[in-house]
Amino acid sequence: ELDEAKAVMTRVKANLPVSESKLDSLSPEFQVQIREMQALMKREAADSKGTCKDLPKGKPEEWLPEIVAEHKGRIVFVDFWATWCGPCRTGMKEMESVKDSLKEKGVDFVYITDTSSDSNDWLAYVARHEGIHYIVPEDKKQAMQIPNYENAIPHYLIYDRKGKFVKAISGWPGVEKMMQELAAVQ
């Protein structure tokens, strides 16, 4: 039951829904703790810049196309990263300085990490970085069929307004280079 409670608590911390039947399956002690955490997370979510979302239903190879399709009509910047990755954190921090101007030009930011990231650290990043945030089971990441991905992060993908893959960038190239790549997309 402890593993189930931990899994539920991870969803609560990510501000993701938990079914009543799932809560009811836990002991009363866990239910009280989880409901208290839900109330706390609801209050904190109001201050968060980012939004956590569940992965789309279906197979891992369907996740990325479905995520991108949700942003049709906008340029999509996908950032594969982890909390323990220094260059990933640097890239996220440096992109904050240009994010508002990019959003005005129609760029949406999607962040995808995996379960190798510490969940508390991940939630802290979600709170500070506006965009849509997903967490993928580490063993499913390869099955996502990420374009030009060679198991190294940071890894960035750019999609055009029609949802067509345009470019993959491995490693943090700096804000100026990233701005050039995004400006080239219509």
Name the predicted role of every residue range.
Residues 74-76, 80-84, 152:
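Short pre-active-site segment immediately N-terminal to redox-active cysteine/selenocysteine motifs
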Residues 80-97:
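Conserved redox-active cysteine motifs that mediate thiol-disulfide chemistry
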Residues 100-141:
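Conserved segment of the thioredoxin-like fold in thiol-based oxidoreductases
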Residues 78, 110-112, 157:
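Conserved hydrophobic packing residues within short motifs/helices of P-loop NTPase cores
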Residues 70-72, 102-104, 125-127, 148-151, ...:
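A structural signal for short secondary-structure junctions
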Residues 50-55, 67-69, 82-87, 112-119, ...:
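Short, contiguous acidic/charged loop-to-helix segments that flank catalytic cores in large enzymes
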Residues 90, 138-183:
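Thiol/disulfide oxidoreductase modules built on the thioredoxin-like
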Residues 1-73:
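Oxidative protein folding and maturation machinery
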